[in-house]
């Protein structure tokens, strides 16, 4: 008797084939892929994010194994993604810079109802007015939470706005159903991004969030320092050379005045200095030698003039001010 080996081929569902084909196409046509953990994430909030990203990015929620097959089909190194393809994920396809996309998402504060154990993201205030809750056992709950109430027309009315939790506080479990009844959502919802893959580079999700103010200040400081160095070394750029030429002129005039070199610009300073020295010499010997002339008091430089002179020296030491530097920043870097 001859044994026959029967081979059966499992038919792959058409929706899976279509899903992989769609994912493969998206992987080939977008430079940035973001993988986000959506475990416990409300479906309605994901829909809100999808609407906000319309025109910027596409969001797909699919099985990890189908995404992995699509990665292979699109020519990606699947090993780069292995550790992130666990649990329920959403896959975001975009050509927008991932940092810009994260900044865009962070501007929208999506909220959800509180669950027992949640911490408040903002101050939770129960407003005064009709709660719509029938009087009965719930009155003791309000009393426990120190919320002043009265019963009117068989309903519980809150007498005054009452804070039941501050940011960072755990929301009392007893208040959770009341908050839901009143339509109060005190917990923010945001996508937990695992990684972004941008032009061949894996960026961990926690590195995508940047403080824009701090970042701007750092760039400004770097700009100012670069401009100061450029001014010091006389970097040949028009805006830099304006400051460099001014500084060189001041130094040249100071040197010329010091050595007594007379030009139209230095003549007054040279002669003034010579007169001052002559007064000083005459005053020092007038008591010992009869000069045949009366030595008048040496002209005094006013305190205000002296202060201005000191300020000028200080300015020369410091170089251009931050305001002056700020005006030349964009020119220095081609802006």
Swiss-Prot record:
Does S-adenosyl-L-methionine show up as a keyword for this record?
no
Keywords carried by this UniProt record:
Ribonucleoprotein, Ribosomal protein, RNA-binding, rRNA-binding
Gene Ontology molecular function? large ribosomal subunit rRNA binding; structural constituent of ribosome
Identify the GO cellular component terms for this protein: cytosolic large ribosomal subunit
Give residue spans, biased composition: Basic and acidic residues. 305-321
Q: Which domain of life is it from?
A: Archaea
Q: Region labeled Disordered — which residues?
A: 300-335
* GO biological process annotation, one example: ribosomal large subunit assembly
Composition bias, Gly residues: 326-335
Record's InterPro entries? Ribosomal_protein_uL10, Ribosomal_uL10, Ribosomal_uL10-like_insert, Ribosomal_uL10-like_insert_sf, Ribosomal_uL10-like_sf, Ribosomal_uL10_arc
User: What Pfam families does the entry give?
Assistant: Ribosomal_L10, RL10P_insert
State the oligomer form and interacting partners: Part of the 50S ribosomal subunit. Forms part of the ribosomal stalk which helps the ribosome interact with GTP-bound translation factors. Forms a heptameric L10(L12)2(L12)2(L12)2 complex, where L10 forms an elongated spine to which the L12 dimers bind in a sequential fashion.
Q: Which family does it belong to?
A: Belongs to the universal ribosomal protein uL10 family.
Task: Cite any additional comment in the entry.
Answer: Was called L10e in this organism; in this case 'e' is for E.coli-like, not eukaryotic-type protein.
Please explain the role this protein plays, according to its UniProt record: Forms part of the ribosomal stalk, playing a central role in the interaction of the ribosome with GTP-bound translation factors.
Protein name as annotated: Large ribosomal subunit protein uL10
